Structure formats: C-alpha cells, structure tokens
Amino acid sequence: KIDIIVKKADATITTIPNAINDLAYSGEEQNLITEGSAEGGKVVYSLDGNTFTEDVPTATNAGEYTVYYNVVGDENHNGVEDTNAIVVTIKKATLTITAEDKSVTYGEEAPTYSVAYSGWKAQDNEDVLVGEITFECEYNTNSNVGTYAINISGVEAQNYEITFVSGVLTVNKANATITNNPNAINDLVYSGEEQTLITEGSAEGGK
C-alpha cells in the first residue's frame, strides 16, 4: 500500500491592492484602496492590523490611514502569511470664510460683523468649527470717511483647510445739520454804512 500525500499549494495575489490617490474629504465614506484578488484564496483587509475582513476599508474623516492586507488560503491552498501595509491619505476639503462687507455713516457705532461660508461638504455647518470667529477692524466712531478692512480669524476644523477672506467696511459721509438758524435783523434803518442783514448761523459737520 502506498500513501500519497497531496500538500496544499500556496495562494498567490493576482491583483495587488493600491492606494486610491487624490482622496479629499467629502463628508461621506470613501474606499481607501482598490480591491485586490488572489488565486487559491481571498484577500482580506484591516485598519488595525489585527481584525481582517474581506471588506475594502473605508473612511470619512481627513487624515492618514494605514491599510493592512494579506491572503487567506482556501481548502487547497496556504495563505500568504506576510502582511502588507498601504498608507492612504484623505486630504482636507477647502472651506472659505468671508467677512461680509458692511457700511456705516460717519460717527456711527461699528456694525455687527458677519461671515459667509463656501465649501461645506454633506451636512456640515458651523458646528464642526473649533474656536470662535474673531473680527478685527480699525474703525471706531472717530474714524474718518473711507474704507477699512474687516479681518477674520480664530477657527479651525478637523476636515477643512480654512481660507479667510477679508471684507470691507465703508464709512460714508454724514449729512451736515444746522445747529443755529440765521435770522433777519429787524428794524434796520439806512445809515449810510454797510450793515449786517442777518444773525450768523452755525452747523455741525459743515459751515
């Protein structure tokens, strides 16, 4: 009697998983790598290097991820024991925060400043910002007519690269007002000399 032992063959990777390039935060889950395939087994993946599944790893937040993979053999094949690693980056999305333009009349208090947002992904809004928006403007109630920059800063976000855009505060001329009306001088009689006909008036913001 002759016993014949058939040893398992080694499984081989036929399609190597690759990092998906140019990933940027979208607010949704995204595949981190392309799907691999193997002859005589199946490719399995992990984000922690311990728990492996057949599901291609996904991620939502911006950051750097390490995807581990190896091959589990079928009943006739040995798996590939070596674990490979792929580093994948999801870049931050761009968020633009713009200080909205404002205007006041000379002498008025500074307005309530505000901003506009451009670039939110999915359902994101101001709630994802860390910090508080700070407004800086050189205008005060004694400032002259003209334009003043409204600068902003003070916030950041995990998934966004923030661009701050300054606004413009325009200070317009105020209307001059008469504070003392000129009045006719009564009972003038010819005297042969020049005479003042009215009392002198005065104005605020002019003459």
PLM feature segments, named:
Residues 1-207:
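Solvent-exposed beta-strand/loop surfaces, strongest in extracytoplasmic domains of secreted
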